[in-house]
Amino acid sequence: TTGRRIPVYFHSEHRQIPRLRELNPNPLVEINPQTAQKLGIVDGQWCRVYNQFGEAYLKAKLTASVKPDVIHAQHGWWFPEEDGNAPHNYGVYRSNINNLIPNFHVGKLGFGAPFKCMLCNIEGTNENFDTDMQLIQDKFGELR
């Protein structure tokens, strides 16, 4: 499922506030421990979530609150500490779960995409995208 609101942020806002970023420094994908074990994914491992439309990299959080064979991704991620110039654009596409939905398929009443879930694959990766909290502090101020 996609679009879970993150309690420490307001949608995509406040990633540049050091104290909030310390509470939730990386984009997470929640996965049931049984599913994770079956796929060889361990808690805290970076994962590639993908389908025929695109991919996103998120960090695994094992939790029994998600049903087996279902994953739940946080939304709204971008990295204000990174380069904002095109094509990088603050890393907005690296961990954007909306990469996995088809573009330009909108609801009849507006321009919002009517997707709350999508078929996808998930695999562990050896890549490391952990947030450098020292960089956050240097760029945006002390952690308080």
Feature names for model-found ranges:
Residues T1-Q16:
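Long, low-complexity segments enriched in small/aliphatic residues
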Residues R15-R144:
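Long, contiguous, secondary-structure-rich segments that constitute the structural scaffold
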